[in-house]
Amino acid sequence: MAKEKPHVNIVFIGHVDHGKSTTIGRLLFDTANIPENIIKKFEEMGEKGKSFKFAWVMDRLKEERERGITIDVAHTKFETPHRYITIIDAPGHRDFVKNMITGASQADAAVLVVAATDGVMPQTKEHAFLARTLGINHIIVAINKMDMVNYDEKKFKQVAEQVKKLLQMLGYKDFPIIPISAWEGDNVVKKSDKMPWYNGPTLLEALDQIPEPPKPVDKPLRIPIQDVYSIKGVGTVPVGRVETGVLRVGDVVIFEPASTIFHKPIQGEVKSIEMHHEPLQEAYPGDNIGFNVRGVGKNDIKRGDVAGHTTNPPTVVRPKDTFKAQIIVLNHPTAITVGYTPVLHAHTTQVAVRFEQLLAKLDPRTGNIVEENPQFIKTGDSAIVILRPTKAMVIEPVKEIPQMGRFAIRDMGQTVAAGMVISIQKAD
């Protein structure tokens, strides 16, 4: 059987109005992946003219977005010769950050869209830094709106240089920088004849070369639980996605923080595993599975618990413990001070956490300390902080298990900050 093409998740990032939506629209339009209903509407109108058709389609997509219907994520799958690509989050989503950290939407790569007319803008920096914080290791740069600078090579080189500086400072290496016009369709899917000075890949070709994400099978087993079901004749079936490690029938697993909270090990032997109603002998990272554990009841575990092997159980941070984290403040109306207690979202858990100490403020671009023990931190700041959970939760240092070490901080219905765990300080 031929090996299936790898699936790759990408996000589009970049400053507002630099053309993220148009670029996505052009990719879908030129690969014939625009939602049926929209194409049908267009054909019913019997309109002429190709460039007009793209403009019309973009207007419809925009209307749908403004009515709160973001292009259904199911439509944003498309194929390249060697990859299945899913655009997991289009721009403009309020919950973009939270989705990226807690959802099924760990991105493998980001497309950073920068307008040739403006160059690097504040949000360009913020989004690039965020991609870094969220552990996106592969980036593709699209310098858009080349039609508005007359496809000028000098202008392209100037903006490319700015972007290069920014990304190298954040530790990115080897990223393609592609001059495109999403509106005119240059170098998105089809090679442009208007920029003979450029001989690199089109955006689609660059997407086709995204490295296949490695599966973290050698890391300790971690399965954050999404739901718990009781199934007649089977028993209790926790459901979740394997983040790291491998689960096999016959393994002995323990659930945390359930075991810590109940002061007794909630553990047992794995009797069966299934995915999409098919029985499995073993499950790997990325697999969404249901599994049954001998002796574990429906009321013993819940969403937010994490399963791991008893030989290397999930790390629990209790209210008497603290953890050190690096955060970037994305959106706070005033300022964050010691004592602030918002809700932390990581994998499938949500726990209120208290800011115990503000250790240092960092330069978001270089990571260097600019101020020790600041009195407060505000939107745009990056900082090292000490956090204390109000109840026991599982979280891991990002260096050990990156999939379990990233989090979003939410308050007042919005994502206030994003961060990663540096280390855990146990009280005993």
Swiss-Prot record:
Name of this chain's protein: Elongation factor 1-alpha
Chain residue ranges for the region called G1: 14-21
Compartments (UniProt record): Cytoplasm
Catalytic activities: GTP + H2O = GDP + phosphate + H(+)
Region (G3): 89-92
UniProtKB keywords: Cytoplasm, Elongation factor, GTP-binding, Hydrolase, Magnesium, Metal-binding, Nucleotide-binding, Protein biosynthesis
GO cellular component: cytoplasm
Similarity comment: family membership: Belongs to the TRAFAC class translation factor GTPase superfamily. Classic translation factor GTPase family. EF-Tu/EF-1A subfamily.
Ranges for region G5: 181-183
Lineage start: Archaea, Methanobacteriati, Methanobacteriota, Thermococci, Thermococcales
Catalytic activity, EC: 3.6.5.3
GO molecular function: GTP binding; GTPase activity; translation elongation factor activity
CDD domains: EF1_alpha (cd01883), EF1_alpha_II (cd03693), EF1_alpha_III (cd03705)
Free-text function comment from the UniProt entry: GTP hydrolase that promotes the GTP-dependent binding of aminoacyl-tRNA to the A-site of ribosomes during protein biosynthesis.
TM region(s), chain numbering: none
